[in-house]
Amino acid sequence: MREPQIWHYGLVARYWGAFETEGGPEMEYYKRLIETSGQPALDLGCGSGRLLIPLLQAGLDVDGCDYSEDILGICRERLEKKGLITHLYPQAMHELDLPRRYRTIFARGVIGLGGEHRLTMQAMQRCYEHLRPNGIFAFDYMVRWNDPPAWMSRLPEKRQSLPQDWPSSAERKCLPDGTEIELVSRTISTDPLENVATRQIRARLWKEDELIKEEIYTQRLDDYSKNELVLMLEKAGFRDLQIYGDFTDEVATPDHNDLIFIAKKNLKKLLRPTHKMPDDGYVSG
């Protein structure tokens, strides 16, 4: 089985840590969810701490987990600068093996990254096992049908023109040390039969208009239907599924760009407990 293919390393991780630092409507949405569903919580795919840091600043008990040690290193640096302390775990979602059990696990924009359906299924099962009874697993998924380029790239004539050329130009952003960084991406291939797209990202680092470093990473993206994700959640043991749109309380419709899935751990699947569960969530013998 292949490992997840993602691109959150090196210069790309540095870009995310420098410029992708502000949360949008998802910030308040997941904050309210944690306050309602309970703590401790786990930010699955926490990246450089875009959501994790403000949640900690709000006084919530939230751990972080990410597959990329590069981006977790940036998250640690940001936490230290702000005087914040939490647990950060460098693990893949499908291999989740943490010492705590959570009342809330949420995943922002990471379901489908890696391009392997079986890994996503395993990740859901691992999330189920890491929840306390009645715990909540929530994630958002950006639909492809409202993204014309992504949708059209499935057509035979579009697939034949792949891989795309790199964009001829890109905006450079200035880093604190005076260097400039730019990111561009392109589609390499699409497979409508497997519902997978393969994309590349190129990061370039400039100093006084001289290119001093270039990195290229490849990422596979799974595409799912709403019903497929529901079936996967149910197979993992989740029940009481709710699906909302665009980080609101509106029931999801075809006009929404982001679907938010909220699922509860099914008590009927629980075996007789073999571990004491203290209030802080740590499993002890």
Regions found by a protein language model. Give the residues of each.
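Conserved class I S-adenosyl-L-methionine
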Residues: M1-Q39, R50
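Class I SAM-dependent methyltransferase "Motif I" SAM/SAH-binding loop
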Residues: G45-G47
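Class I SAM-dependent methyltransferase SAM/SAH-binding core
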Residues: L52-E95
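A short acidic, Gly/Pro-enriched loop at the edge of an enzyme's catalytic core
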Residues: D97-I105
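A short beta-strand submotif of the Rossmann-like class I SAM-dependent methyltransferase core
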Residues: A107-V110
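A short glycine-rich, Lys/Arg-flanked "PGG" loop and its adjoining helix->strand segment in the class I
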Residues: M121-P133
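SAM-dependent methyltransferase
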Residues: A138-E228
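C-terminal lobe and adjacent flexible extensions of AdoMet/dcAdoMet transferase-like proteins
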Residues: Y217-G285
